[in-house]
């Protein structure tokens, strides 16, 4: 009963996490999308896709938890209930869930999302009102463009089905049972391995750009979130500028007797410039008033004050996240050096590391946390979500680009539906890169075997498990490098690590690209971190004015509700100088 209870609790926790992922996907989609350009089709596809992606990335802690539950950490042997048949059934269930989620992700990202993208592009408001184009015509137009992606999926599958695996030709020198099992795959598995391996490579390239940037920028955004001007101060500064502007307009009109037709061209140009500036200042004053809660309910004003009060906690959280980022970076650097120096077969198998030779902080932390169940699984879930959130942060900062040309911006409340769909596809590929990075670089030993250990003593009789109850020093953490025959029966690798190692062993070029991309990841993170640490956050007034103008055109000024820094001023509602004057500029 105990093993079934533990397994059930793990799956129940996963189901709850997926439910929270659905809620997060809904909030994320509606928060980032333009309110006036919302589409039911785009929203549904984006929510389902994001939920599927989060469910996929959250499956890794479940995978590790299940394989870890099969063994006794202190004795280095399988538990009584962990028979080969029971373990095989558990792994088969995990494989089914993995294959189902990855197949769903591939279907969504390569077919459904492109179809939704072209469906939205086919939409025309005039044709919709006049009824000149049928739904069937729009469906055909979207399917016509989506067919190219369907052909791409078929090509990937058939190439993987017929291309011989390079690992089969170079695997003869690998005398470890673990690697031999990785090479044993049928044609269907080989085709799927090739397709996913190629997508992992593409995702790793995006991961290098976006996740590395986000991993550095996300903590810094918490630490340096306070801009250099507060809402009360912005209101006062804007009011002063608006008063000077109108005074100058009155001077120009008095100078020319109020006759605009006889006004010199120089004065006319200056007056036109002042009028444009006045409109900008009026919009800015409205935003400052809304930021202070004027015209809003007491609930909103109270919430704004609470956020200002707890802003120091945001600073502390940013410092802690920065510490986590640095520790993860150091751990990945150590793993990179360890793999480059001590890999069993170097580039021939994608730099698979048989056993950790250098102390690795993150891996050590997981092994120590495993002593207090389920702390290690909670930390792993946090690490996975931290990488995921960092990817979103990097995507929002960098935007969707082709080379140096920005195609779409990812901004809260201003993201076009097309950008939402493209960003979802990019996040799907990045998820593959995150899975590789966490499993192979951040916590390589823990991600493969979890907390499993192996008793190196010889069994007392044939068919019996070894006994290390009186020799705890002979209990070692499981690793791919063990050559004992019983090791393969006691040490059960996670499904994710097995799949990734199969990719890198069968197609070493994928493994080489994924491995050396981690070096680029470390370099980009360091550059972005150092740069952002020495940059002072500034309030982008031009961007603020653009957003205010867009809100005014859309009639959405009531929902803007921006907050500015200067904690104490936002709490008191004063700028530290004279009280704000009424603008009367509406």
UniProtKB/Swiss-Prot annotation:
Glycans are attached at residue 540. The keyword Transmembrane applies. It comes from the Eukaryota. GO terms for biological process: protein localization to vacuole. It is a multi-pass membrane protein. InterPro entries: LMBD1_LysCbl_Transport, LMBR1-like_membr_prot. It holds the Pfam family LMBR1. One of its GO terms (molecular function) is cobalamin binding. The keyword Cell wall biogenesis/degradation does not apply. The chain crosses the membrane at residues 10-30, 47-67, 96-116, 147-167, 191-211, 315-335, 378-398, 420-440, 509-529. It is found in: Lysosome membrane. Keywords: Cobalamin, Cobalt, Glycoprotein, Lysosome, Membrane, Transmembrane, Transmembrane helix, Transport. GO terms for cellular component: vacuolar membrane. Probable lysosomal cobalamin transporter. Required to export cobalamin from lysosomes allowing its conversion to cofactors. Belongs to the LIMR family. LMBRD1 subfamily. This is Probable lysosomal cobalamin transporter. It comes from Pyricularia oryzae (strain 70-15 / ATCC MYA-4617 / FGSC 8958) (Rice blast fungus).
